[in-house]
């Protein structure tokens, strides 16, 4: 799942933009005020609705809406459109807002098709594999809290990776809770299988990333 093309019309300071994304990654650079954050915000606005359509759970809802200040000064409305490639199928989805009425519109057929493919390919009764995820790391993304004690508990499932995907303010609360739960599960499996070398695949993936960024190894002694 990826964006192939992004079209902006009268969005913030951008009168018109047509951006084609090529390759596996894209770098957007420029001096202050050229619209880098504007482009990222437009992508967030599209994915917020897509995530809400796919998940449809209150606790994972992304509160990210087009505002009147997103409409370029002097323009009657603003529009954001993107062409998505999902497993080889091209789908267009867009959102717009009219200044005079404040009404917001979206391409319901496009977002429904994206959601349908997502569920068919990744979350059907027969398939429970890895899913495409979206994460926004804005310039002002903050870690507000690193809790040492977990007072509330969550039920983790395949949708949990999309929690707070758009928000700029985050904490590690649910991550630590998930990690502890997985460690308990891993230890239980060691006893059940009578194999002290058993490793949970999810934990191993997180450990590998952590050790890589710390420039450390699991066998290092301190």
Q: Predicted segment positions?
A:
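Single conserved hydrophobic/aromatic residue that forms the stacking wall/gate
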Residues: 213-222
């Amino acid at each position: 799942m990826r964006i192939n093309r992004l079209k902006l019309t009268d969005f913030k300071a951008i009168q018109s933009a047509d951006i084609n994304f090529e390759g596996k990654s894209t770098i957007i650079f420029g001096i202050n005020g050229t619209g880098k954050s504007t482009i990222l915000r437009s992508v967030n606005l599209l994915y917020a609705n897509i995530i809400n359509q796919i998940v449809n759970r209150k606790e994972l809802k992304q509160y990210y809406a087009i505002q009147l200040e997103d409409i370029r000064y002097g323009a009657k409305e603003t529009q954001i459109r993107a062409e998505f490639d999902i497993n080889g199928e091209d789908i267009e989805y867009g959102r717009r807002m009219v200044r005079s009425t404040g009404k917001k519109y979206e391409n319901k057929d496009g977002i429904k098709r994206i959601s349908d493919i997502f569920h068919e390919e990744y979350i059907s009764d027969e398939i429970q594999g890895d899913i495409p995820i979206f994460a926004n790391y804005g310039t002002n993304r903050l870690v507000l809290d690193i809790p040492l004690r977990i007072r509330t508990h969550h039920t983790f499932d395949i949708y949990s990776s999309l929690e707070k995907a758009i928000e700029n303010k985050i904490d590690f609360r649910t991550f630590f809770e998930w990690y502890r739960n997985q460690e308990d599960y891993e230890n239980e499996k060691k006893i059940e299988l009578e194999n002290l070398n058993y490793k949970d695949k999810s934990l191993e993936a997180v450990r590998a990333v952590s050790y890589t960024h710390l420039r450390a190894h699991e066998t290092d002694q301190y």
